Amino acid sequence: MPAGLHVLLLRVFGRLPVQARRAVVRLLTPSFTVGANCVIERDDGAILLVRQVYRKQWGLPGGLLERGEEPVDAVRREVVEEVGLTVEVVGEPAVVVAPEPRRVDVVFRARPLGPLPDVIEPLSPEISAVRWHLPGELPELQEEAAQALVTLARSATGEIAGRLHRLVGEPLPGER
């Protein structure tokens, strides 16, 4: 596009009402779905994984945000809906962007609040199984769950970083 035409279009765009500008931007930019997932860690280092009825591999508890919902609120809601646990979110989240299928996942670390039941049963019809898994005994993970764990490990610091790196089988920076 010639520079003069580009400038003219930007000036016209700038004169549009705010709502019209937002509509144009939404129309012309790619849209992504946004999910919130969490790594729930027990005191012994085991993490809680879920198996969805429509997938073979294991994944993290969580799901898509509802319209207007904050990611941290969505992850708390999803964990209660799927497995009946109340969790405390710990630290800063990691963000995983998947250009295809155009999805952004906000991944939190969390720990359960209150006493844990001996067995955690799925509460959602979309979850077929729920289990705690120790770091050396992880089952086959969904691709997005594996990516979330790696991203969270790479953004963590201190003792948490060591535990997450061991969980995903990746050396800490400087250990290579």
Task: Give, region by region, the residue ranges found by the protein language model.
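Acidic, metal-coordinating catalytic segment for phosphate/diphosphate chemistry
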Residues: M1-N37
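Short connector loops at helix/strand junctions that flank enzyme active sites
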Residues: S31-G35, R42, V53, L60, ...
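Conserved beta-strand and immediately adjacent loop positions that scaffold enzyme active sites
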Residues: N37, A46, A129
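Conserved hydrophobic "DFG−1" position in protein kinase catalytic cores
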Residues: I40-E41, L49, A110, W132
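Conserved Nudix-box catalytic region and its N-terminal flanking loop in Nudix hydrolases
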Residues: R42-E81
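Unchanged
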Residues: L65-E88, V96-L152, E175-R176
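Charged phosphate-binding loop/patch that engages nucleotide di/tri-phosphates or the phosphate backbone
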Residues: V150-R176
